[in-house]
């Protein structure tokens, strides 16, 4: 079973402010995110409550897993679909992913969810879009642990300068 992290960061590893992206949407990054997380159609995306609320909808063609102690499926009776599950812990999420045998599982945020998965040492690789601008942020991606080595670099946009790092 494979777990990967996918994230866009600015200088200082910022990823958000007030539960929103601190930068205007970058089409190239959004397309890359969609392509990677959809994969062969049997992938999951894993997010915390605030990331789910900031997106405001389920992302299609992927199984959406929301980790939250305060949300539960009773809150979303009208919008629960076969492609969505609300779970109360990282451990429950890992067990669920094992049971469902998704091809790939992408951790998509936020800060606490990234940190917990990285601390468990089960993230195989990290796809990081690095935006070479500084933005005000109140949420940050943890420093990439030393066990990861930079594997690939790909330029994806010029203004602002964005590159894809694969760790």
Where are the regions that the model predicts?
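Enzymes that bind and transform nitrogen-containing heteroaromatic metabolites
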Residues: 1-167
